[in-house]
């Protein structure tokens, strides 16, 4: 108990800060807990937080749910999609919010205060804490229910993937009319919409939901991502450089979770590379391929 109390009161001693580049070129601060605090947070996540149900509209960070795929499937049959983004999502959830969450779960004020301290840093949810995504989902329960109630009356599909809010309808006018009301609810729940990231999609242009492309009511992973994967595979095989093997496997698994059979496609692609004469003539390439197979079930490359 004394150790937990110390962890909760001296958070600044148990976090490491890193700068992570964002797509727009700016930097994001990532506060990651050191191992001792991370172990405690993992226990809180599994033994406390994940035993509380999130709203049915929360798609991300839910155990047993393929959130990205399920999210896209819910919107794929609609003609128009409105995507909105919550600004500074984790940073908008305060230590007080987390304290009240634990009291609602059933803990007394003292325990709730300790748990809130263990799960926050500098007064808000930290980007790098394992507990932050699920806490954010629980905090957003009221937001999800209010937005869904508004949308259900208008035959609009609503989902939330972390800080990405998705709304779809067969009627563009309904989405236009509801946008202001959506922002008011989001603001009333303590968040702000990042207007720069608000986007409309329709059937006359490529539709995307949380990064997944929808064409002809079918969902696909981003084409540029798949091109990048093939490029990485070719580089690994032809240059005998498997330093990014783990990343390649992870990217393939991600796309395969969206598009059934993608792993098999990439296995066939690698088997095709293994048959290329110009590659089989290099002892270095052959040896590296056979020693670093991206998939265990691939046949050996036969040297010439």
Role assignments for model-derived ranges:
Residues 83-87, 128, 132, 154-169, ...:
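Catalytic palm active-site di-aspartate
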């Amino acid at each position: 108990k004394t150790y937990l109390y110390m962890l909760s009161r001296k958070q600044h001693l148990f976090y490491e800060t890193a700068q992570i580049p964002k797509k727009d070129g700016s930097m994001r601060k990532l506060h990651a807990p050191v191992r001792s605090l991370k172990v405690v947070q993992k226990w809180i996540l599994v033994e406390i937080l994940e035993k509380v149900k999130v709203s049915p509209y929360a798609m991300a960070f839910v155990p047993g749910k393929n959130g990205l795929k399920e999210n896209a499937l819910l919107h794929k049959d609609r003609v128009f999609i409105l995507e909105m983004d919550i600004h500074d999502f984790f940073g908008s959830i305060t230590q007080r919010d987390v304290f009240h969450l634990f009291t609602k779960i059933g803990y007394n004020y003292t325990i709730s205060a300790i748990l809130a301290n263990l799960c926050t840093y500098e007064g808000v949810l930290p980007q790098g804490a394992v507990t932050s995504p699920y806490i954010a989902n629980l905090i957003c329960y009221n937001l999800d229910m209010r937005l869904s109630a508004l949308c259900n009356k208008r035959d609009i599909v609503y989902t939330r993937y972390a800080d990405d809010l998705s709304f779809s309808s067969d009627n563009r006018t309904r989405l236009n009319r509801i946008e202001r009301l959506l922002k008011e609810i989001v603001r009333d729940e303590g968040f702000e919409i990042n207007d720069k990231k608000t986007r409309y999609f329709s059937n006359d242009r490529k539709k995307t939901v949380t990064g997944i492309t929808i064409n002809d009511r079918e969902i696909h992973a981003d084409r540029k991502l798949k091109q990048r994967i093939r490029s990485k595979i070719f580089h690994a095989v032809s240059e005998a450089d498997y330093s990014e093997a783990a990343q390649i496997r992870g990217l393939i698994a991600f796309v395969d979770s969206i598009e059934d059979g993608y792993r098999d496609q990439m296995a066939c692609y690698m088997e095709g590379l293994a048959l290329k004469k110009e590659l089989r003539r290099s002892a270095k390439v052959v040896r590296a391929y056979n020693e670093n197979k991206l998939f265990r079930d691939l046949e050996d490359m036969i040297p010439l």
